[in-house]
């Protein structure tokens, strides 16, 4: 049986509180790497250590608690619960935390306070993604994992969502790890990893960081 190596020779270190971008074309392995960091998938060799804890040494119950307490996930598809309001969707995330953020303050930060009682079907794509981010961040996770969070949005709405992720990173101090194929987005990152064919080809600290609102593509 021929095995395909999706990732090979990966070695990366991310500092607490950094805005980090994993950049690469489709099929480069960036989403798989994000899933391994998030303990959704597992590597055949090597390990992920977050705050010194190796996820491969945890049993399933420990992993579940670890994901709940320390990780937040934002995907290209919003995955909101259709029969719950904006507030209720965010509350789902709050229930998973011992130390959730204040929901009213968070909705104001997200720019969706006036949409609190609406259902997902009544929202624009950008409003749905803001709600999805709210559900992920209300847990106050150490790390926010974002897989193509602007992939389904137009460029103006994309920049609004990126500005929101930037604001959250600065306000709450969460480490943000974002997967994207959009080369321009790397300019807002503190640290950039460029992937190609399952390998990290570039790894650098961005000395000329640009505000999300000033990104151009």
Language-model features: locations:
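Conserved beta-strand-loop-alpha-helix hinge in the C-terminal portion
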Residues: 199-217
């Amino acid at each position: 049986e021929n095995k395909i190596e999706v990732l090979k020779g990966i070695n990366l270190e991310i500092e607490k509180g950094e805005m980090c971008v994993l950049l690469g074309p489709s099929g480069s392995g960036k989403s798989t790497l994000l899933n391994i960091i998030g303990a959704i998938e597992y590597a055949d060799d090597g390990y992920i250590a977050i705050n010194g804890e190796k996820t491969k040494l945890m049993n399933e119950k420990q992993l579940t608690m670890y994901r709940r307490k320390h990780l937040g996930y934002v995907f290209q598809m919003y995955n909101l619960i259709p029969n719950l309001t904006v507030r209720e969707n965010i509350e789902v995330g709050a229930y998973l935390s011992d130390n959730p953020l204040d929901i009213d303050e968070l909705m104001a930060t997200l720019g969706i306070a006036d949409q609190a009682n609406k259902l997902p079907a009544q929202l624009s794509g950008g409003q749905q993604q803001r709600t999805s981010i709210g559900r992920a961040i209300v847990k106050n996770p150490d790390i926010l994992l974002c897989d193509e969070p602007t992939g389904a949005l137009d460029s103006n709405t994309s920049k609004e969502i990126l500005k929101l992720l930037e604001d959250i990173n600065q306000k709450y101090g969460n480490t943000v790890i974002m997967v994207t194929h959009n080369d321009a987005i790397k300019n807002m990152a503190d640290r950039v990893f460029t992937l190609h064919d399952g390998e990290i080809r570039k790894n650098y600290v961005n000395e000329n960081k640009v505000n999300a609102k000033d990104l151009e593509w």
